[in-house]
A protein has these predicted regions:
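N-terminal secretory signal peptides that target proteins for export/translocation
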Residues: 1-7
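Helix-centric, low-specificity signal for extended rod-like, repetitive segments
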Residues: 1, 12-15, 33, 154
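Bacterial N-terminal signal peptides
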Residues: 8-22
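Short S/T/G/P-rich N-terminal loop/turn motif that feeds into the first structured element of a domain
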Residues: 19, 24-233, 242-262
């Protein structure tokens, strides 16, 4: 609860600046406007907690979000099973207004409150998770909306990458690099990107976050090799304007849970 209140307070302070740089529609989704994403990370200490988090999203939260028109919601866990695996939840919103209205709508949704009661009111002696954190992301202009994999090619591997830059200008340079060639090449070689985003509020700033997908790990590695061999990528790498625009990369391989709509 404290984390959620803190996040809302930061958003309230930053909202005017965000709206100036990324104006958003008040009512309907606009294809010309980038989506916003909440990326939530739950820290767990047992497989029981992982199951409780998954059940909460599957049976309570996702139905409530869908009733608000927010979908698809992605729920993922680390690809190698372990008791301390984190759970990652990706929530797409068409505007900051929609994102900001979520807490009040959940509070007023009696079906949600009833279905989520055991999770929301978990006692100190039997908590549903260790902690969770949230990042607010905004989609790149080069891919403004979340993209679902083709129905006939459901991926079993999702790769979540965070690229951390040493300064704001270096971070913007890396985004430009994506939009000037990396995104089209990734699509062409079969990396099946789900989303690309810049972190507005969250850890490791300035940074960008994106997700690609693949049928399996072997196929995913082959797709990356195709990207690395692409002439456009090699030309971008050699361009001095993009030199040293990433200082650190965080790479996590995920799989969907039974709750996931992605």
């Amino acid at each position: 609860m404290v984390q959620r209140l803190a996040l809302r307070a930061v958003i309230a302070l930053c909202l005017p600046l965000i709206l100036i740089s990324h104006p958003c529609p008040v009512v309907a989704a606009d294809e010309d406007q980038p989506q916003y994403y909440e990326l939530r990370t739950y820290v767990t200490k047992s497989t029981e907690q992982q199951q409780r988090i998954n059940d909460y999203w599957q049976n309570a939260a996702i139905p409530a979000y869908n009733r608000m028109g927010i979908q698809p919601v992605g729920v993922f866990t680390e690809i190698q099973d372990a008791p301390t695996n984190s759970i990652y939840v990706l929530i797409p919103c068409d505007s900051l207004e929609i994102f900001g209205a979520i807490p009040a709508k959940l509070a007023a949704d009696t079906d949600y409150q009833q279905a989520a009661a055991g999770f929301l009111d978990a006692p100190k002696t039997n908590p549903a998770y260790v902690s969770f954190s949230s990042s607010l992301l905004v989609a790149f202009n080069g891919m403004k909306h979340l993209s679902l994999p083709p129905p006939d090619k459901k991926p079993n591997v999702f790769e979540l990458r965070t690229y951390i830059s040493s300064s704001d200008s270096k971070g913007l340079s890396k985004i430009k690099m994506f939009e000037n060639g990396e995104i089209p090449v990734m699509k062409q070689v079969g990396l099946a990107p789900i989303f690309y985003s810049r972190t507005v509020i969250g850890p490791h700033m300035p940074c960008l976050v994106y997700m690609t997908s693949g049928e399996n790990m072997e196929a995913h590695k082959k797709h990356w090799q195709g990207f690395n061999d692409a002439p456009i990528w090699k030309a971008l790498q050699a361009d001095p304007q993009y030199k040293d625009n990433v200082s650190h990369i965080i790479q996590i391989f995920l799989k969907r849970t039974t709750a996931s709509q992605i």
